[in-house]
Amino acid sequence: MSTQTLRVGIGGPVGSGKTALVARLCQELRERFNIAVVTNDIYTEEDAQFLIRHQALTEDRIIGVETGGCPHTAIREDASMNLAAIDTLTARHPGLDLVLVESGGDNLSATFSPELSDLTLYVIDVSAGDKIPRKGGPGITKSDLLIINKTDLAPIVGASLEVMDRDARKMRGDKPFIFSNMKTGEGLQDIIRFIIDQGMLQAA
């Protein structure tokens, strides 16, 4: 068991597949690690309810934060609601190894406060077009791991994975990125390996 709780921030635009990724990560990791989730929604707890319905974790391990107004503020300038939620989860479940913090749907300029996130994953999806990686922004260029999700939609929307691969390399330099598809599980084990290795997680 880790001595300190690893906080992983998961950001990305609305509809990119953040909640589906969180659900899959929980299902894969819950037997090996003591984990919990904080979700951010503007006016509802819809993402938290999705995770509960899909039995990602037990309900007492999931807290939905209603950010109101601008969701970026809750993960950056004023992370107090999220930090309070993490404190609540830590009190409920002593010895937490991992907390996944899912941001509300954001734009390419949103970033996590360093006090809220030790590792940041940024999720974009192929259906938004193959130009997204080269648009840049902190999510694309500075996140610890960029996840290019919904690869199965590439032929439908006419997006080139080769172009996205090239542009992601150009924009990110040496920083890693992974192509994924949560329906088939493509890329999931690579994402898990990244979290465990970079977060130095040790199974109990």
From Swiss-Prot:
InterPro entries the UniProt entry points to: CobW/HypB/UreG_nucleotide-bd, P-loop_NTPase, UreG
This protein's UniProt keywords: Chaperone, Cytoplasm, GTP-binding, Nickel insertion, Nucleotide-binding
**UniProt-annotated binding residues for GTP:** 12-19
Q: Name one GO biological process term.
A: urea catabolic process
Gene Ontology, cellular component aspect = cytoplasm
Q: Report whether Nucleotide-binding shows up as a keyword of the record.
A: yes
Tell me where in or outside the cell this protein is found.
Cytoplasm
Does this UniProt record's set of keywords contain GTP-binding?
A: yes
Main location (coarse class): cytoplasm
PANTHER family with a match to the protein in the record: UREASE ACCESSORY PROTEIN G
Q: Which family does it belong to?
A: Belongs to the SIMIBI class G3E GTPase family. UreG subfamily.
What is the name of this protein? Answer: Urease accessory protein UreG
